[in-house]
């Protein structure tokens, strides 16, 4: 006897087997259980998320500091270089990698090495190594030392190019701002002197400017210079204030190595940060650092490449150097890493990478303190000197930080003078 297929399907739907009913009921109960557990977790967690993946930054701390709920803080987690756009910009950078989309409001004020955003070639120094230690200082509530900051004495905008046919270096002093801001003296006018080092040959002296704080120099100078001298010479830009007794007082100086500019290939234009000449005399060596920030992973990478011409403490003739890198927030130590010790070497090559987890929302509150120290048998190293890098620093420290933010995902290398502690 033939059975109608349609009637058979209807009979199965109207009167399903008992085991199918059990399967459906178990599935429904499982879904209800999962939904109930999820709702319970959301209710008990309130407005706070699960523990932050960043070891040094908990969003509870962000709420406490900024007085915002986590949701509001999360919505504000946009990189500072995209948060604001300046309405007035200086001369555009000549480096192709510095596009408008990648920069922030200070891009027109990058310092003397704004051309250094190229890839860091570490091949001569061997394989890149991870830092030896990562001593944790991530207790948010802990109070630790507050380190001092360097101070800038204004900025000057300059441009220069080299005429290979006539072997002539052309230098233009365009403008200055925030000049002569010194607490110990008052000046009504100033002028600038450009000299060629190490011979201290005078390239040019500007006219005296009466409005000494934000002024337009618009001065152009030229000096004969052999192409081979570009690898050896430096330019010094010095600002002098004129006091009420008509005395010329040095108020700020900056030196620029011509070897880093590639002037035979392209002109240079940028802002230079002036510093106290007395501070420049406190240098006890130089250190080459590379910085990069990966916004997608919110990761800050510091590479301690090498140091040179280190001067040991207490007139020592030999020492074993190493480098400590502190991540600071509002002057407080949040994390610390250090390199391996190099035995008896005033020109050590470290080539060690240090990685910090840094949310973009706190980038503007951060700075780096890089300390060169001497290892000792008792485990307490004497500090040789330090470098401050960040938005609150000055000179090369600010320049390097700004350049890192302007060329995201790419390492930016720069030499820094090591200041005596």
Curated annotation (Swiss-Prot):
Residues on Cytoplasmic side: 40-421
Report the superkingdom from the record.
Eukaryota
Modifications made to the protein after synthesis: Phosphorylation of Ser-97 is required for mossy-fiber long-term potentiation.
Q: How does it sit in the membrane?
A: Single-pass membrane protein
Q: Which GO terms describe its molecular function?
A: calcium ion sensor activity; calcium-dependent phospholipid binding; SNARE binding
Q: Please name the SMART domains in this protein's record.
A: C2
State which ranges are Vesicular (membrane side).
1-18
Q: Where does this protein reside within or beyond the cell?
A: Cytoplasmic vesicle, Secretory vesicle, Synaptic vesicle membrane
Recorded hits in CDD domains, A to Z, give: C2B_Synaptotagmin-12
Ranges of residues in domain C2: 152-272, 283-416
User: Keywords in UniProt for this one?
Assistant: Cytoplasmic vesicle, Membrane, Phosphoprotein, Repeat, Synapse, Transmembrane, Transmembrane helix
**BP term (GO), one:** long-term synaptic potentiation
Which coarse location class describes where this protein primarily resides? Answer: membrane
Q: In which tissues is it expressed?
A: Expressed in the brain, specifically in neurons of the cerebellum, cortex, hippocampus, olfactory bulb, brainstem and spinal cord (at protein level).
In its keyword annotation, does this UniProt entry include RNA-binding? no
Family to which the UniProt record says this protein belongs: Belongs to the synaptotagmin family.
Q: What does this protein do?
A: Synaptic vesicle phosphoprotein that enhances spontaneous neurotransmitter release but does not effect induced neurotransmitter release. Unlike other synaptotagmins, it does not bind Ca(2+) or phospholipids. Essential for mossy-fiber long-term potentiation in the hippocampus.
Q: Which PANTHER family does the protein's record reference?
A: SYNAPTOTAGMIN, SYNAPTOTAGMIN-12
What is the annotated quaternary arrangement, including any partners? Homodimer. Can also form heterodimers. Interacts with SYT1.
Name of the molecule in the record: Synaptotagmin-12
**Which species is this record about?**
Rattus norvegicus
């Amino acid at each position: 006897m033939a059975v109608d297929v349609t009637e058979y399907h209807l009979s199965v739907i109207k009167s399903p087997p008992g085991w199918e009913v059990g399967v459906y009921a178990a599935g429904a109960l499982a879904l209800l259980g999962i939904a109930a557990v999820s709702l319970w977790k959301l209710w008990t967690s309130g407005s706070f998320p699960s523990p932050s993946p960043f070891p040094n930054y908990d969003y509870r701390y962000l709420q406490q500091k900024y007085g915002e709920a986590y949701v509001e803080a999360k919505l504000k987690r946009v990189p500072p270089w995209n948060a604001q756009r300046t309405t007035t910009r200086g001369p555009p950078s000549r480096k192709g990698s510095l596009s408008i989309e990648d920069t922030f409001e200070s891009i027109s004020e990058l310092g003397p090495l704004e051309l250094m955003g190229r890839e860091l070639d570490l091949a001569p120094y061997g394989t890149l190594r991870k830092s030896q230690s990562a001593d944790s200082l991530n207790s948010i509530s802990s109070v630790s030392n507050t380190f001092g900051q360097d101070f800038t004495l204004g900025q000057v905008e300059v441009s220069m190019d080299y005429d290979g046919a006539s072997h002539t270096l052309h230098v233009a002093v365009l403008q200055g701002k925030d000049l002569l801001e010194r607490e110990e003296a008052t000046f009504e006018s100033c002028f600038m002197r450009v000299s060629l080092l190490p011979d201290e040959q005078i390239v040019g002296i500007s006219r005296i400017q009466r409005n000494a704080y934000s002024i337009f120099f618009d001065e152009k100078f030229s000096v004969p210079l052999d192409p081979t001298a570009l690898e050896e010479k430096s330019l010094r830009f010095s600002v002098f204030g004129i006091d009420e007794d008509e005395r010329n007082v040095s108020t700020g100086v900056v030196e620029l190595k011509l070897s880093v500019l590639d002037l035979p290939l392209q002109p240079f234009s940028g802002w230079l940060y002036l510093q106290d000449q007395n501070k420049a005399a406190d240098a006890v060596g130089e250190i080459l650092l590379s910085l990069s920030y990966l916004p997608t992973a919110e990761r800050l990478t510091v590479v301690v490449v090498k140091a040179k011409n280190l001067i040991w403490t207490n007139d020592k003739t030999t020492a074993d150097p190493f480098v400590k890198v502190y991540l600071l927030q509002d002057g407080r130590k949040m994390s610390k890493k250090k390199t391996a010790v190099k035995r008896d070497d005033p020109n050590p090559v470290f080539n060690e990478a240090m990685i910090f987890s840094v949310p973009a929302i706190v980038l503007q509150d951060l700075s780096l303190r890089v300390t060169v120290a001497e290892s000792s048998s008792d485990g307490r190293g004497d500090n040789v000197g330090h470098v401050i890098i960040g938005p609150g620093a000055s000179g090369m420290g600010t320049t390097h930080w700004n350049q890192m933010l302007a060329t995201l995902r790419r390492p930016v290398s720069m030499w820094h003078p090591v200041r005596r502690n």
